[in-house]
Amino acid sequence: MKFVDSATIFVQAGDGGKGCVSFRREKYVPKGGPDGGDGGRGGHVWLKTNSHLTTLLDFKYKRHYDAGRGTHGQGSRKTGKDGADIVIEVPCGTVVRNAATKEVIADLTVDDEKVLIANGGRGGRGNQHFATPTRQAPRFSEPPGKGESLELEFELKLMADVGLVGFPNAGKSTLISVMSAARPKIADYPFTTLVPNLGIVRYEDYKSFVVADIPGIIEGAAEGRGLGLQFLRHIERTKVLAVLVAADSGDIALEYRTLLGEMEKFDAALLDKPRIAIVTKMDIAPEDLVIPSFEDGVTVLAISSVTGTGLKELKDEMWVRVSSHASDKKYLDRREEE
């Protein structure tokens, strides 16, 4: 399925139904009073998250969503039916903005979360409500309310436990393919991965966590070079960052520092997230390779997705980080301060 992480749609809540102008007409009641019923309320527009959705692709094909209109009131004080609500399903991690003002309306991160986006118009009141001692036969009703309309911008930020970050050809796609059932495109040239991929890693005792393979970052990604700016936002919601550098890349310490620098330029709070340094492709590592400590407090693991070297230790470390209750606290605190 094609991955789409932004979309714009137009929603229209239903108008209310008209109030009825009617008078009671029965045998032996020649001068019955007003009995016009109220119109029904217009349908609301709701957004609801669905954890099974991972893309905004559907909104590229359908951009207009209309709720039902309330039916009109009738005589004998009969109230019209409310218009049908419409529920639009979106992936978890969807940020919803007013397209006109850019104001964030909702940030939907929990499965099955439901948010009212546009209110239906109220039903007009029938003439039964307007009789007075001096106006016993009102020949008018209250006009119905209009349903709210809104243009919405959706931005999807993937919900994953671990985000794999690295330069093109660092081995991210190969790693996620051997750790999970994900099957991203893999080839020996840069930018094979053009969209993020999600994989579920099965751990011992029926535990599991989600890993996201983010398309390769290059130097200058925070300024829009390569594919970086388009996809860096997908690591904002991850709990743990796994920073990958290839053993055959030359200066792995410089590459690691460059990756951290690009993330800091995009959002300095990302560096508050717990991270793991991973040296990949150890099966083709130079014989004289010396793996540095990179930085204090960061676990460094050397792995090979081809031979399986270090993968068990990597899964263990990822699980420890993901299951830590305070794993994302510093990052969230800083985001709230901003």
Curated annotation (Swiss-Prot):
GO terms for molecular function: GTP binding; GTPase activity; magnesium ion binding. It is an enzyme of class 3 (hydrolase). Residues 160-323 form the OBG-type G domain. Its EC number is 3.6.5.-. It is found in: Cytoplasm. Residues 121-145 are annotated as: Disordered. Its cofactor is Mg(2+). Pfam families: GTP1_OBG (PF01018), MMR_HSR1 (PF01926). InterPro entries: G_OBG, GTP-bd, GTP-bd_Obg/CgtA, GTP1-OBG_CS, GTP1_OBG_dom, GTP1_OBG_dom_sf, OBG_GTPase, P-loop_NTPase. Mg(2+) binds at S173, T193. Its main location: cytoplasm. GO terms for cellular component: cytoplasm. Residues 1-159 form the Obg domain. Keywords: Cytoplasm, GTP-binding, Hydrolase, Magnesium, Metal-binding, Nucleotide-binding. GO terms for biological process: ribosome biogenesis. GTP binds at residues 166-173, 191-195, 213-216, 280-283, 304-306. PANTHER family: DEVELOPMENTALLY REGULATED GTP-BINDING PROTEIN-RELATED, MITOCHONDRIAL RIBOSOME-ASSOCIATED GTPASE 2. An essential GTPase which binds GTP, GDP and possibly (p)ppGpp with moderate affinity, with high nucleotide exchange rates and a fairly low GTP hydrolysis rate. Plays a role in control of the cell cycle, stress response, ribosome biogenesis and in those bacteria that undergo differentiation, in morphogenesis control. Monomer. Belongs to the TRAFAC class OBG-HflX-like GTPase superfamily. OBG GTPase family. This is GTPase Obg. It comes from Chlorobium limicola (strain DSM 245 / NBRC 103803 / 6330).
